[in-house]
């Protein structure tokens, strides 16, 4: 990617993200963090709150840190979300080895164009964003730094320290991300040891960082409650209990790992097969193509046996990678495919699981598919630009009315509280299916007279609401 193209891509993406993140309203647990943020007046207050949550209910230290400091600080929240998403696009492209403007734009569109259920729990919802986007960003950044170190066969102390810090910090968010990072760090350490006949200091430092971060996360006393009936997240005791949980979770697991994600479910086979079409096909080429196409048809049109269809899809994907790619692209694609499975596997044994938990797997599958991208022609670049513009316009058509309703709500609350009203009527959000927990009583965490809950919020249809 030429410097001028790179600058245009980044500035365009930054502008689009800035507009959308400004339009996204607070929803669900964001209101709790909004009220909490107003009560944090010093670093000591913040540290005490983080330690208290680590000991009791929520050990995700860095996820909580970002969510708490952005509570009641809309400009900071807007800047953080815009910058972190832009960095995610940038380092995802770097990890995938993408150097063209069209490739960058296509990957950015893929990362943003999530299935609706995942999208509304990741981008519009601040609490979800700060727990799920940063760890993926940190992992991809670490992968890029580590790949450079292995290529140069040098492990300067600053680079090793950076990898140690990235490995440690990336673990202080979501649990399945943490497990995936530990497995990835261990694999890379062993692989470089076998390949180079000696351990790589860079890989060892990253692995050590992931172990230390995971130790801090999982030694939280809050995890002692996962077998209790009233815990927010639960894990059955014993092997039989775990297997029963895995069986119950299997439909959700297969749906949000692959079957319910058309961008990766269809995109990977399309890119892989198109990359091979110009060459002479052999019998061995037909096998992965048949597995990929057959499993896609199965997932789309056959309601039963979805788990088996997903299994065949991954078999076809690995077959395509090892048959149709070579060198660094093959290694990257296989690593990303395995990473997607490793990130999803722990979710089989915990309840409840939400679509947002599969964000890291979704991104890794996109990066695997990106290894099949051909060098773009001009017409392809224009098509990708038109696609990105269309998705941006669609988002505006959904979230601009939501933004206007959020402003109406805020004005109505301000007027009602000035009059001392104990019950406040508010209009429902339009397009509420694109928001997480949109019309919620959790507003009372941010709006109250003396104690949270002394105001009741009543939601009414837009046509029945009047100021």
Whereabouts are the PLM-identified features?
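Intrinsically disordered, polar/acidic, low-complexity terminal segments
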Residues: 3-62, 67-90, 95-103, 199, ...
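Signature aromatic-anchored transmembrane alpha helix within multi-pass, membrane-resident enzymes
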Residues: 159, 284-293, 325-341, 373-395
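Short hydrophobic alpha-helices at membrane interfaces in multi-pass membrane enzymes
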Residues: 148-169, 198-205
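Alpha-helical transmembrane segments
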Residues: 5-19, 103-110, 162-167, 205-212, ...
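Transmembrane catalytic cores of multi-pass membrane glycosyltransferases
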Residues: 20-76, 126, 175-323, 348-351, ...
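Membrane-interface micro-motifs in multi-pass membrane enzymes
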Residues: 104-147, 174, 301-319, 342-369
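Transmembrane alpha-helical segments
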Residues: 84-95, 138-150, 182-190, 265-270, ...
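Membrane-interface alpha helices of multi-pass inner-membrane proteins
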Residues: 158-186
């Amino acid at each position: 990617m030429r410097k001028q193209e790179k600058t245009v891509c980044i500035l365009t993406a930054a502008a689009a993200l800035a507009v959308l993140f400004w339009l996204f309203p607070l929803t669900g647990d964001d209101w709790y963090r909004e009220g909490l943020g107003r009560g944090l007046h010093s670093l000591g207050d913040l540290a005490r709150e983080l330690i208290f949550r680590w000991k009791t209910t929520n050990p995700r230290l860095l996820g909580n840190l970002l969510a708490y400091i952005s509570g009641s600080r809309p400009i900071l929240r807007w800047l953080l979300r815009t910058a972190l998403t832009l960095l995610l696009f940038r380092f995802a492209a770097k990890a995938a080895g993408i150097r063209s403007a069209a490739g960058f734009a296509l990957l950015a569109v893929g990362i943003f164009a999530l299935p609706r259920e995942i999208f509304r729990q990741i981008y519009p919802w601040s609490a979800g964003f700060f727990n799920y986007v940063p760890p993926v960003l940190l992992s991809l950044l670490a992968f890029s730094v580590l790949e450079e170190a292995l290529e140069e066969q040098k492990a300067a102390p600053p680079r090793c320290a950076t990898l140690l810090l990235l490995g440690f910090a990336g673990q202080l968010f979501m649990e399945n991300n943490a497990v995936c990072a530990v497995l990835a760090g261990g694999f890379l350490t062993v692989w470089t040891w076998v390949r180079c006949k000696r351990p790589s200091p860079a890989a060892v430092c990253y692995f050590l960082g992931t172990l230390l971060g995971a130790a801090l996360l999982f030694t939280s006393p809050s995890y002692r409650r996962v077998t209790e009936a009233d815990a927010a997240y639960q894990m059955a005791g014993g092997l039989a209990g775990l297997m029963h949980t895995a069986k119950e979770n299997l439909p959700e697991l297969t749906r949000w790992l692959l079957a319910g994600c058309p961008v990766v479910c269809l995109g990977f086979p399309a890119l892989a097969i198109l990359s091979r079409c110009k060459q002479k096909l052999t019998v061995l080429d037909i096998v992965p193509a048949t597995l990929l196409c057959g499993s896609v048809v199965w997932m789309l049109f056959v309601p039963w046996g979805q788990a088996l269809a997903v299994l065949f899809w991954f078999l076809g994907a690995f077959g395509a990678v090892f048959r149709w790619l070579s060198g660094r692209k093959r290694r990257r694609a296989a690593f990303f495919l395995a990473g997607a499975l490793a990130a999803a596997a722990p979710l089989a044994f915990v309840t409840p699981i939400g679509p947002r938990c599969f964000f890291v797997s979704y991104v890794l599958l996109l990066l695997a598919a990106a290894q099949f991208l051909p060098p773009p022609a001009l017409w392809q670049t224009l098509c990708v630009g038109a696609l990105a513009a269309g998705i941006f316009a669609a988002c505006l058509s959904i979230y601009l009315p939501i933004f206007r309703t959020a402003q109406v709500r805020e004005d109505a609350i301000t007027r009602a509280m000035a009059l001392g009203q104990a019950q406040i009527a508010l209009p429902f959000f339009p397009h509420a299916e694109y928001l997480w927990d949109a019309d919620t009583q959790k507003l009372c965490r941010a709006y109250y007279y003396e104690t949270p809950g002394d105001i009741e919020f009543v939601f009414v249809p837009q046509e029945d609401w009047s100021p």
